[in-house]
Structures are given as structure tokens and as C-alpha cells.
Curated annotation (Swiss-Prot):
InterPro entries: NDK-like_dom, NDK-like_dom_sf, Nucleoside_diP_kinase, Nucleoside_diP_kinase_AS. Keywords: ATP-binding, Cytoplasm, Kinase, Magnesium, Metal-binding, Nucleotide metabolism, Nucleotide-binding, Phosphoprotein, Transferase. The keyword Disulfide bond does not apply. It is found in: Cytoplasm. It comes from the Bacteria. This is Nucleoside diphosphate kinase. The gene is ndk. It comes from Thioalkalivibrio sulfidiphilus (strain HL-EbGR7). It catalyses: a 2'-deoxyribonucleoside 5'-diphosphate + ATP = a 2'-deoxyribonucleoside 5'-triphosphate + ADP; a ribonucleoside 5'-diphosphate + ATP = a ribonucleoside 5'-triphosphate + ADP. Its cofactor is Mg(2+). ATP binds at residues 11, 59, 87, 93, 104, 114.
Length: 143
């Protein structure tokens, strides 16, 4: 098993529901450590840049509009197989398909407002973490 890092975003709908602490508890109980975190209100430019891979998809404008509709919490998580573990904790993209007890099953309303984002691969995790955090902003968790 490899120690990995992944990017996680608590989206505006979950921030508005005031479930940040509950989501963090799930990360930590699963063995993921928060090594960087920040609350921010994404600009349109930031949201478009982050989700540029989806630029030609029909949902792109709605996704960007949603992501700038309120503050988000962006964090880098670290742990054994962090990418896959985080995706398991989040649940399926569509909360209707998400397993009971996952973040999306418990806190998301729809596929459009689905509470959280997580990197889909180790390669993308590195790119996504670098989008939001400078290397010196990531704290080693050795204790």
C-alpha cells in the first residue's frame, strides 16, 4: 500500500448545510490526514480553470455557476491509497446511486449539487493539489 495525496473540495451546497465538520470526521475516521486546507470563494476564472477538462461538456456552465455560488473548503488529504479511499468515502457522483453512509448519500441533493469533489486518479491529484496549494503550504503530518 502506498501513501498518496488527493485533492478534496467540500462544495457550496455542503458548506451551506454546515456539515464541514461531519465530512472532516469521515475523512479522519477512514485514516486520511488533512495536510492542507483553505476556505475560499472561487472566482469564475478559478472555477473555469479547475474544471477546464469539462469545457466542452454540456454541464460546464452550470458546474462553474454552482462552484462560484458560495464558499468552498479545499483540502489536500494524505493516507494509504488516498485517491481510492477518498472516492469510496464520497460515494457515487449521483447521490441516488451512492451507497448508504457515503458523503453524497447523506449530504448531496442531486448529481449537480453533490457535496464534494475528489481527484479521480493519482496523476490528476497532483495537478489538482498544485492548482490550489504551493508546496510550502502542505504540512507534513509526522505525528
Amino acid at each position: 500500500m502506498a501513501v498518496e495525496r488527493t485533492l478534496s473540495i467540500i462544495k457550496p451546497d455542503a458548506v451551506a448545510k454546515n456539515v464541514i465538520g461531519e465530512i472532516y470526521t469521515r475523512f479522519e475516521k477512514a485514516g486520511l490526514k488533512i495536510v492542507a486546507a483553505r476556505m475560499m470563494h472561487l472566482s469564475r476564472e478559478q472555477a473555469e480553470g479547475f474544471y477546464a477538462v469539462h469545457k466542452e461538456r454540456p454541464f460546464f456552465k452550470d458546474l462553474v455557476d454552482f462552484m462560484i455560488s458560495g464558499p468552498v473548503i479545499v483540502q489536500a488529504l494524505e493516507g494509504e491509497n488516498a485517491v481510492a479511499l477518498h472516492r469510496d468515502i464520497m460515494g457515487a457522483t449521483n447521490p441516488k446511486d451512492a451507497a448508504p453512509g457515503t458523503i453524497r448519500a447523506d449530504f448531496a441533493e442531486s448529481i449537480d449539487e453533490n457535496a464534494v469533489h475528489g481527484s479521480d486518479s493519482l496523476e490528476n491529484a497532483g495537478k489538482e493539489i498544485a492548482f490550489f496549494f504551493k508546496p510550502e503550504e502542505i504540512c507534513a503530518r509526522t505525528r
